Amino acid sequence: GASSLKIEGRLKEVDYVKNVTAFYRQKLDEIFARRSDLQKASFGRSEYDFIPKLEKSFNRGFTSYFFTGKREKMASFLTPKSIGEPIGKVLTVKEKSLLIDTQEVLNNGDGFCVIDNFDHIIGFRINKAVGNEVFPADRVKVGKGGMVYRNFDQNFNNAVNHSNTSRKLAVSIKFFETEAGFNLNLICENGLLCSQSVVMSKELAQKPQKENIIKQLSRLG
């Protein structure tokens, strides 16, 4: 079976790396949750505040190759470019705008491409979206009924770029008094132990400090 995953990151933007790694992390965690006979090789827990979706990042299509058996077709020869995810069809062509038959929410700044009946690809960015009506930044020649793909989702990109993605390790903390001062032990989930002692004089606190100590030590992340 597979022991590692190679994620293409050369010359890719931060949003691509964030989205793709979060997607695979999510899928791996789903497998580990239902397979008690498997465990991950790394430690920690990844947290992200967006829903990863591979179709939102640069890709040249997807294939299962021979994973589920032999296939007649394994590649698309339509274009080497990233056409994005299908969202609908061109409903009406106006002088400065297009009406798209779609259930998706369209955003100012989105990028699209339209594939016509002759497999010609017309790509464009929009300045404005009002409902399902989009206003391209430049004039485009597309026909009614053409398949519309979105290859740049402005809102999704903003969400990924401003996300607080992090990886946290579970730590057990023990703080206790010694004859000469105090001692602090931290045990990471991978078994590593860090211990620090401090020699100092002691004075009785005017107020109980247990809750304050717990609060301060909980600020590790």
Question: Residues of each region from the PLM?
Answer:
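Surface-exposed amphipathic alpha-helical tracts and adjacent flexible/coil segments at the periphery
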Residues: 1-221
